[in-house]
Swiss-Prot record:
Belongs to the frog skin active peptide (FSAP) family. Brevinin subfamily. The lineage of its organism: Eukaryota, Metazoa, Chordata, Craniata, Vertebrata. Keywords: Antimicrobial, Disulfide bond, Secreted. It comes from Pelophylax ridibundus. One of its GO terms (biological process) is defense response. This is Brevinin-2Rf. One of its GO terms (cellular component) is extracellular region. Antimicrobial peptide. Expressed by the skin glands. It is found in: Secreted.
Amino acid sequence: GIFLNALKNFAKTAGKGVLQSVLNTASCKLSKQC
């Protein structure tokens, strides 16, 4: 239902945010700019 869809959308958005920060951390470590 609506609740499940909202939960899925939230998980997708949260997952993107986590992935983005992991990528940012990894790239800053690789370029030694942390």
